[in-house]
Swiss-Prot record:
NCBIfam families: dut, PRK00601.1. This enzyme is involved in nucleotide metabolism: it produces dUMP, the immediate precursor of thymidine nucleotides and it decreases the intracellular concentration of dUTP so that uracil cannot be incorporated into DNA. Belongs to the dUTPase family. Its cofactor is Mg(2+). Substrate binds at residues 63-65, 76, 80-82, 90. GO terms for biological process: dUMP biosynthetic process; dUTP catabolic process. GO terms for molecular function: dUTP diphosphatase activity; magnesium ion binding. Pathway: Pyrimidine metabolism; dUMP biosynthesis; dUMP from dCTP (dUTP route): step 2/2. Its EC number is 3.6.1.23. It comes from Finegoldia magna (strain ATCC 29328 / DSM 20472 / WAL 2508) (Peptostreptococcus magnus). InterPro entries: dUTPase, dUTPase-like, dUTPase-like_sf, dUTPase_trimeric. This is Deoxyuridine 5'-triphosphate nucleotidohydrolase.
Amino acid sequence: MKVKIINKSNNPLPKYSTIGSSGMDLRAYTENDITLKPLERTLIPTGIYISIPEGYEIQIRPRSGLSIKHGITLINCVGTIDSDYRGEIKIPVVNLSNEEYTISTGDRICQMILQKYENIEFAEVEVLDETDRNDGGFGHTGY
């Protein structure tokens, strides 16, 4: 699928790392290094602007290696960029480690995944269909 992109950074365009990759890494684009203290959070600019096709969203997800090795992850776990957004993609990160971590231009900071979605049209009713589970919630299937 062809998707329009503006790259105002000096980083390469996002690309798939392997033939089976579902996500592309996004890279930081900053004038100066950004050092995050423990539990500090900030928005990391990418210099990337994307025209997302209608009926799709871009999901922003943490990079597993960055999370497990350095405690750097996304504030909202999975972020959504809507198809009508045209601003710069900025990544909300948090340092969950006990050590400072520095992010520099070109560092891979998250993954983006293009995802199709359907809009919901609610049909208001008085009763929902029954299932084997019904209203069994947290812990219902065991711990």
